[in-house]
Amino acid sequence: MTQLTAQDVKRFGTERGLDLVGIANIERFEGAPPRMHPAAIMPRAKSVVVVARRILRGNWRGIEEGTYWPTYTYFGYHGLLNSFFMPMPLYDLACFIEDHGHEAVPYYPGVPEKQPPEQPLRPGAVGPDVHLQIRIAGTAAGLGEMGWAKVFMTKKFGPRVRLHAIITEAELEPDPLMEPGTLCDRCMACVKGCT
């Protein structure tokens, strides 16, 4: 096992094209429901590394003009961003952590197609398909905060990000939490935009 610091993890992630990398210690998930807790996936987890890639501002241009939607669909909300652009550097970062002697589980925040069975597959475990709340993980890793409409926001990209995570046994220094109200002043623009 070789020395691995939070700065090493962040540097490697950003070199691979991730826009933001934040770290939460496992204690920040205390009180999470068992089927949403990172330790249900990795019982000896010590840290959760949350990563973000931006959704380009230009992805909204065709929608705003009322002329072109596919850019947002493929390069923004899901499509290539979630299923191609994010997993590759996420996997590289998990390999980097494991190359330093710490087990790492890359976490894809997709929603299961159907509800899994409630019964655990082994005694003392939770049922299958544990589903982390990725926006809460992003908040716990200091990357941003949830606004009034429960949309995750960052200082650099606002709400235009997609999040993924790595659960690891590496004990990494956590990032400071963002003070609630730093980004969302409850102006209700999100509510007005949806009505």
Label for each model-derived stretch:
Residues 32, 39, 75-195:
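Catalytic cores of enzyme domains
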Residues 1-91:
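Non-catalytic, usually N-terminal nucleic-acid engagement modules in DNA/RNA processing proteins
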